[in-house]
Amino acid sequence: AVHDAEGKEIPLTHGNYIALLENQNRDILKEAFENLYSVYKQFSNTLSAAFGANVKQAVFYAKARNYTSSRQSSLSGNEVPESVYDNLVASVRKSLPLLHRYASLRKKLLGVEELHMYDLYVPMVAEADRHYTFEEAKDIVKTGLAPMGEEYLGLLQEGFDNRWIDIYENEGKRSGAYSWGVYGCHPYVLLNFHGTLNDVFTLAHEMGHSIHTWYSNKNQSYTYSGYKIFVAEVASTCNEALLIRHLLKNSKDKQEKAYLLNYFLESFRGTLFRQTMFAEFEQK
């Protein structure tokens, strides 16, 4: 749990962790971050052993199938040359000055002497921060995805109307957001909706996955209906790009537009720089 300015206890869960990190009260940010990761630290040896075992397993299977490395084994399933992986890491590293510039701007606008991990999610433009109901989120997503056409919007509405989505956090429910399904049945979406702007984008993102799955199942046999993770994120991030474009185009308020640009910049940090850092960590 964490405590607000009045000392009231707020439950800390995997589902509401990111929402708490968007709070303007820095004490709440710090407490939420430290309380969550202190639990993981208690199991550091177990987590290290599990990670080590996973690496050994990947190496074993790669050698058994005559690959030169587990990386080559992983990429070959998508027919992606290792040079693409290397070029991604190298190109992103060349762009690190842009990330550092963004971090400096965030530090300046937040007015902090040191920038910590728990400072990365809080909006830099507090005045435009707002809460969305799920009904508002659905309307925003439908309007933003209008360029996808009537058929696509019809499927989107079908998902909204026919219980494709488990919306809110609940006891025992896993964190994050996912889309999943089986052949012959419509997909299902898991959300942990708390009414943030990020939650609105998450709805658009996960419905992108679900409608991709719906179309794939409709047009392919069971054997060929699945798709690789390498292409899976195209459908979802396309929806996010359309949504941010719509919101920026129609925003009439400078503060709101700055808030949206803040979100867009943070999505670049998380999607491009952060994921490539993971890739480089695994490579080394």
Stretch-by-stretch model annotation:
Residues 1-284:
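Cation-handling catalytic/transport regions enriched in His/Asp/Glu
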